[in-house]
Amino acid sequence: MSLDNIRDQIGKYILTDGMSQIVDLGKSHGAWLVDARDGKEYLDLFSMTASMPVGYNHPYVLKNQDRFISSALNKPANSDIYSNEMADFVTTMGRVAQPNYLPYAFYVEGGALAVENALKAAFDWKVRKNLADGKGEKGSKIIHFKECFHGRSGYTMSLTDSSDPRKTMYYPQFDWPRIDSPKIHYPLDDQSLQNVINSSGVKVPSE
């Protein structure tokens, strides 16, 4: 297909309000995205919404692509039936990323659903703790920052402070407390850094 027609062709079937670049998946490398139209390289600072943390065409991935192809051909229900590939995966994740004080992992496919499952765990833990302390069935509110994005699935819509309210205006949401984010603005100066320090509760003695 002609590169000039790709965006129009996709636009026949879905909303195309994304970036203008047409990614060349074969030539992109490391943290650099290559535009298929002109070969220009862009430093990918969002790594495809954090779905490509090792970058494009990582040497290890290319060397072991047969393993990845085999896994991509089939999508088993990993919560119900197991495979050698799954055993390798959970063993590696357990060794590399799982701390000893958290013996069990719960894998979720996608950021919004990962946030939702973290919320469920927090609700369950907090309410049980309050019940045990005689405080009643409390602990079902989530404090969160303004101008944040955690997804647009069920619970996460109540956390996402969308820059375009039309996207969620008719969806029911929980009235959870939303607070200012202690962000910094460039250029950095003594005052902006002091604001961050103060918001974290750190008190720096005057000279």
Outline where the language-model segments fall.
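Glycine-rich loop-to-alpha-helix module at the N-terminal edge of alpha/beta enzyme cores
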Residues: 12-14, 22, 41-133
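Short, compositionally biased leader-like segments
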Residues: 1-18
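Short, acidic, Ser/Thr-enriched surface-loop or helix-capping motifs
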Residues: 35-37
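Generic alpha-helical secondary structure signal
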Residues: 4-8, 59-63, 84-87, 191-194, ...
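Short, P/G- and charge-enriched loop/turn segments at secondary-structure junctions
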Residues: 17-21, 165
